[in-house]
């Protein structure tokens, strides 16, 4: 295992985050930094900053909130230069994204349910999570709970092989809750630390989704009363604000506890990371920064802003 760094992950993760955020850092966020650097702080600057935050896919309401917080910080601390304002904005953004709690992974086993519409990178995210936790020394088992799509189980099985973890699957059309029940029971009996479960990516309406997921959550507790349960929703960073709007209903119905944001390396905007917690009320737990199996990394607000908005070194 690699030693963990200052922000809860090692140098490898830090480098991956740096590379994965290259487009975002040099794109809109680069122009935000250029706007602030060398500027005097006045209303024009705030207006321009608000506009650029919206272009960076932060969303209107979040952009206004960030700029208002910056105005307050500038006044409170008597900041004079754009460089000082940039450092202050960096801290405000990190605060905005900070989760209130850690992930609940203390159960026997710890169960992570992964949900999301088809096409966002759900299956690959599950394999990458399995790889990540295996590298942390955990014994991981996968549950092929997306039984509505024949290809889903096969795809997950291939990825499970790459991650070197066992998988429990059933025939097409089997009840997802039953597959997940069998997996959790088997994992508990065999001393596995964690079960990561796939779920259907298309359910026709909200009540179907709620029924399916509450069945799954009951089956987890029935299979192993000491299990803990996290439900992570996978979102595609490239579709940004659209993804967040679509996810609102899904989150409520699914009782999600956190977000996996994929394809962050494929967008120059990347501001939707900042908007997710504000708009969905859920913390980002992992970000996808590439195609490789080890390209899903734990998200930390400090690590993120460190790479996105390098400190100018000005005191404030």
Briefly describe each language-model feature range.
Residues 1-29:
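N-terminal accessory targeting/assembly segments
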Residues 175-190, 204-315:
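Conserved catalytic-core segment of NTP-binding enzymes
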Residues 18, 23-147, 152-188, 192-197:
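Primarily NTPase-proximal linker/entry elements flanking Walker-type ATP/GTP-binding cores
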